Amino acid sequence: MQILLEDPTKAAQAQVLASQLNQTDYPQFALVFTPERLELRKLDEPKLGAVYVDFVEGAVAHRRKFGGGRGQSIAKAVGLKAGAMPTVVDATAGLGRDAFVLASLGCKVTLIERSPVVAALLQDGLMRAAQDPEIGPWVSERMRLLQGPAVDNLLALPERPDVIYLDPMFPHKQKSALVKKEMRVFQSLVGPDLDADALLPAALQMADKRVVVKRPDYAGWLNEHKPSMAIETKSNRFDVYVMAALAAG
């Protein structure tokens, strides 16, 4: 993994990151420190552009402001009914978009990301978000990141969260430019979640109230385990495994 500097003032950060990633062997990728952020670039396919985490501007910010609040499907799936404010572990954090939505609605969210490269992008995005005057205070309070295998981190949690959220990597059929770009970069970097079926038993063991699994509409149940209910959207489905009712706060 190459680490490139387009902003010389970030040399110290680059050195720390290089020492953290010294066991990762991805010659076709580079992590680039630009003046604005940390970016992941696929060197052999530069037309794919950069992948990075941005909670302050762009699509994620638009979704926070205009995405439907507690009426959106993910909020219903995790149980954000009137007064309930569950603690959530997102065990397959990726670029953190769903975790950010839940945090913006008031949940305390622990993000688990197995890829050290993706975790570095997430950490950079969280750090920049924490410095933003509008969202910084609650991002710092409600979002924390753990790096490592999801099952190991789930089983090592000091307290059982109310909800565990899973969105395992699944081959995408959609042809949208954004999905194609990010999924091509992601799947060539981290590959599919081959241990995805092992996630569900660990999540069911550790969640106090419910487990939510996000699936493409064409995918079967995770681990072939029938959910208590499903909430369907245009292209995805939230399979919900309910263990106990969520108390209103």
From Swiss-Prot:
GO terms for cellular component: cytoplasm. Keywords: Cytoplasm, Methyltransferase, rRNA processing, S-adenosyl-L-methionine, Transferase. It holds the Pfam family SAM_MT. It comes from the Bacteria. S-adenosyl-L-methionine binds at residues 97-98, 113-114, 167. InterPro entries: 16SrRNA_methylTrfase_J, SAM-dependent_MTases_sf. This is Ribosomal RNA small subunit methyltransferase J. It comes from Aeromonas salmonicida (strain A449). The lineage of its organism: Bacteria, Pseudomonadati, Pseudomonadota, Gammaproteobacteria, Aeromonadales. The gene is rsmJ.
